[in-house]
């Protein structure tokens, strides 16, 4: 007959194992494109199918991604639809090469892909874009740009569309982004948005490597 002590030890171990299983079940990992909801947040993970990329959803607004190789991806958590709000993010962002950390999203009618870039790797994403002006928000000047994309992937399939960019001069990997300040600045420069589709705090990588673990709220 087992002793009370051994029974207690068994149940303690079983309880710990159950807790660990429950914690693991909160993480959903993907290596191919996926969208949906996770713990109260919308998530989007797009990849061109190249390279070695693993995206994982964590508790609440947390996500992580690791990547390497010759591929392109955009991944993160946020809201659907997007819009004017204060977006808070924190965590670790460790790129090696071409990568961005941004508030990222789309509108429709017109079809616009937009970036509020908070940090980036070795390549400034505004390179080759047309500068339209600046806006000061959340403790930094942001440079505003537009660029055109022809026959490229979009939320409406392969399409031609415009990209809007706000690129922060003082890079950071945590803080609060007041998105409405950027949307208003863009509008004042004739850069109209349409109806909001999703908006996420995204990590993007292109022919690079790195890791990120970001929590959004």
From Swiss-Prot:
- What InterPro entries does this protein's entry cite? ConA-like_dom_sf, GH11/12, GH11_AS_1, GH11_dom, Glyco_hydro_11
Q: Which residues form the active site?
A: 113 (nucleophile), 204 (proton donor)
Q: Which GO terms describe its cellular component?
A: extracellular region
The catalysed reaction is: Endohydrolysis of (1->4)-beta-D-xylosidic linkages in xylans
The organism's place on the tree of life at top rank:
Eukaryota
Which molecular function term from Gene Ontology is one that the record holds?
A: endo-1,4-beta-xylanase activity
Q: Which Gene3D superfamilies match?
A: 2.60.120.180
Compartment list = Secreted
In terms of SUPFAM superfamilies, this protein maps to: Concanavalin A-like lectins/glucanases
This entry's Enzyme Commission designation comes to: 3.2.1.8
Q: Which keywords label this protein?
A: Carbohydrate metabolism, Glycosidase, Hydrolase, Polysaccharide degradation, Secreted, Signal, Xylan degradation
Report the function annotation for this chain.
Endo-1,4-beta-xylanase involved in the hydrolysis of xylan, a major structural heterogeneous polysaccharide found in plant biomass representing the second most abundant polysaccharide in the biosphere, after cellulose.
Q: Which family does this protein fall into?
A: Belongs to the glycosyl hydrolase 11 (cellulase G) family.
Any idea what this protein is called? Answer: Endo-1,4-beta-xylanase A
Look up and give the organism this protein is from.
Answer: Penicillium citrinum
């Amino acid at each position: 007959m087992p002793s009370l002590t051994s029974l207690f030890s068994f149940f303690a171990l079983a309880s710990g194992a159950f807790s660990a299983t429950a914690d693991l079940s909160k993480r959903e990992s993907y290596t191919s494109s996926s969208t949906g909801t996770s713990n109260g947040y919308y998530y989007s993970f797009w990849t061109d199918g190249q390279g070695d990329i693993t995206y994982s959803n964590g508790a609440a607004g947390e996500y992580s991604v690791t990547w390497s190789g010759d591929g392109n991806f955009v991944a993160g958590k946020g809201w659907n639809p997007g819009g004017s709000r204060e977006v808070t993010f924190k965590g670790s962002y460790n790129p090696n090469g071409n990568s961005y950390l941004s508030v990222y999203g789309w509108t429709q009618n017109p079809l616009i892909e937009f970036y509020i870039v908070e940090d980036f790797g070795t390549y400034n994403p505004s390179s080759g874009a047309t500068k339209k002006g600046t806006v000061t928000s959340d403790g930094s000047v942001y440079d505003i740009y537009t660029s055109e994309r022809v026959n490229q992937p979009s939320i409406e399939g392969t399409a031609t569309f415009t990209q809007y960019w706000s690129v922060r001069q003082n890079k950071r990997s945590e803080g609060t982004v007041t998105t409405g300040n950027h949307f208003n600045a863009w509008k004042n420069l004739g850069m109209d948005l349409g109806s909001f589709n999703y908006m996420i705090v995204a990590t993007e990588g292109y022919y690079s490597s790195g890791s990120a673990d970001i929590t959004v709220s």
